[in-house]
Design a protein with these regions (language model features):
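Non-catalytic terminal accessory segments
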Residues: 1, 11-13, 151, 254-329
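Acidic, metal/ion-coordinating pockets
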Residues: 1-246, 258, 288-300
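Short, surface-exposed linear segments at secondary-structure transitions and domain or protein termini
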Residues: 247-253
Length: 329
């Protein structure tokens, strides 16, 4: 619903670009259900929403690889916008993606854009999902794309599905793993604008070196409106984090309604029963005293897999379970 509501707020003109930073195929029951029943529904829900808002360019996030090559191809082919990802090599030859592009606005400004995904995809992703893909080193790909774009554009933009490796207030290094490289990209490469993601951390604006950087929070609850101007001294930027709101247009909502109704029925299907409900657990309380929800999940995983040790990851929001457990929980 966040993407559909966002689409209702966008009023494009010839000097507007709509960009997205990836991780669109994971994290919602709607997409999970759709990917398991794609042959029953003619419209890809995520692509429909992005197309409704006029998404021009986007890059891939690490979670967009979770469902394999064919699911990724179906998503990219359903999108009207162009996928830019300079460090993804398509060995299968069926993905419509480019390393970078130059978009000329109505006012004549040339916007050079590239996309990069954290190369930690190689660490996290199941090997079978990457058989037809090669994810190369993110910084090297960004550097090469910037070098190609810089001489032929007025504003150079990197859509980076990765985050900041430093504390933005103190400069303290938070991680040297290479998962997040936004600060290094901003300092060492000649991008004017760095659109980051991955960390789910709202950053309305920060200047690192000569680069203006931003990051929207997760789940399409808010979006970033960035305004740019080119003057004699170079590109100048301002940005605002804005709420998505609760209004959507009739289409593509009506086209997607049969899928939404099927998802709601699926979410209400019973999966088990507890002797008593587990109330929502605050993060600090769970960290100090343990989590009944995590304990239950781990016991189920141990029982069904025969493993010796089980770990589970809980969501960002405190959650509990009703006595009658459904897919909705």
């Amino acid at each position: 619903s966040g993407l559909l509501n966002l689409a209702a707020q966008i009023d494009k003109n010839g000097n507007t670009l709509v960009l997205d930073g990836g991780d669109s195929l994971q994290g919602t029951p709607l997409v999970q259900y759709y990917l398991a029943h794609a042959d029953e529904f003619p419209h890809h829900p995520v692509a429909e929403a992005f197309n409704a808002m006029g998404c021009d360019y986007f890059t891939l996030g690490n979670h967009d690889f979770n469902f394999g090559y064919d699911a990724l191809r179906a998503y990219l082919c359903a999108m009207d916008g162009v996928c830019l990802c300079a460090n993804v090599q398509d060995l299968g030859g069926a993905l419509p993606l480019l390393p970078e592009t130059v978009h000329t606005l109505k006012n004549g400004l040339r916007i050079g854009i590239t996309g990069i995904v954290t190369d930690y995809v190689n660490v996290w992703e199941q090997p079978q999902n990457l058989k037809k893909l090669r994810i190369t080193e993110a910084f090297d790909a960004a550097r090469a794309a910037c070098a190609r774009l810089r001489p032929i554009c007025d504003i150079c933009v990197c859509i980076y599905h990765g985050g900041f490796e430093e504390d933005l207030h103190t400069g303290a290094v938070l991680s040297g793993s290479g998962e997040n490289l936004a600060c290094r990209i901003a300092r060492e490469l000649d991008f004017d604008l760095l659109l980051t993601g991955h960390q789910h951390m709202p950053v309305e604006s920060v200047r690192i070196g000569g680069t203006f950087a931003v990051q929207p929070p997760a789940n399409a609850g808010r979006y970033l409106q960035v305004e740019a101007a080119v003057r004699d001294g170079g590109a100048e930027f301002s940005a605002r984090l804005l709420p998505v709101g609760g209004i959507h247009r009739e289409q593509p909502y009506r086209r997607l309604l049969p899928l939404e109704q099927a998802v709601q029925r699926w979410l209400d299907e019973p999966v088990g029963h507890l002797e008593q409900a587990i109330p929502p657990e605050e993060k600090l309380c769970a960290a100090l005293h343990g989590s009944a929800v995590a304990a239950l999940f781990n016991q189920v995983q141990l029982s069904h897999t025969g493993a010796d040790i089980s770990c589970t990851s809980l969501g960002n929001e405190p959650a509990g379970l009703a006595a009658s457990v459904t897919m909705r929980a």
